[in-house]
Amino acid sequence: MAKKNMIQREIKREKLEKKYYLKRLAIKEQLKKTTSFAEKIELRQKLQEMPRNSAPVRSRNRCWLTGRSRGYYRDFGLSRHVFREMSHECLLPGVTKSSW
């Protein structure tokens, strides 16, 4: 189980991402369209003034049950440990153990 403060930090980052998403997108579009070097510097400065945690790069995928960040399966939103336990207990529909 991950520390509760780490889980809360990720939740805070997700909220900031959603809050600044449109603003960040608009600035990036302007940055692509402009050709003037001075304007590009100004727009990059605006991006840098935004909170760091509002950047989507800083968020980390975490298991929704335990908060574990490593061994994460995107399709299920679970870490490998929880995925294995739940699949053995038949709690994940359509998941079967392979054998050959």
Curated annotation (Swiss-Prot):
A GO CC term attached to the entry: small ribosomal subunit
Domain of life the protein comes from: Eukaryota
UniProt keyword annotations, A-Z: Chloroplast, Plastid, Ribonucleoprotein, Ribosomal protein, RNA-binding, rRNA-binding
Molecular function terms from GO: rRNA binding; structural constituent of ribosome
Subcellular location: Plastid, Chloroplast
PROSITE patterns according to UniProt: RIBOSOMAL_S14
HAMAP family assigned to the protein according to its UniProt record, in alphabetical order: Ribosomal_uS14_1 (MF_00537)
Subunit structure of this chain's protein: Part of the 30S ribosomal subunit.
Name the UniProt record assigns to this protein: Small ribosomal subunit protein uS14c
Gene: rps14
